[in-house]
């Protein structure tokens, strides 16, 4: 349960920083704070990070943009997925859903809680579990993410 997690994981309440980030044109990649990954990894024991940069990889096995994690098999993996949050996120959510359904993967998605999007209604609502932290995620640089996060869990079809 993530309800008790916010105090332990240093939630963000910096409204000025949130507004500054929301109005910037920076890229849509957000590195997962290590505390959040560690907390989820205790429960899921991840084996694959399919969408990362070499310097942000959270698992021994990982795919970078050059490897194209969308084109790789995730069969029987325990996947931690923090995809780019731009227009491609729907493709990543489809991949997570399909790999759990068809290839025995357990996929935990660390994604914006964008309940008004097509990808949310097409894939996220089909997840085995959806968790919502109470507060926004705080970055290691002291800033915070400009949107609420959800942890979406697709379990393998048995």
Regions found by a protein language model. Give the residues of each.
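Class I S-adenosyl-L-methionine-dependent methyltransferase catalytic core
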Residues: 2-158
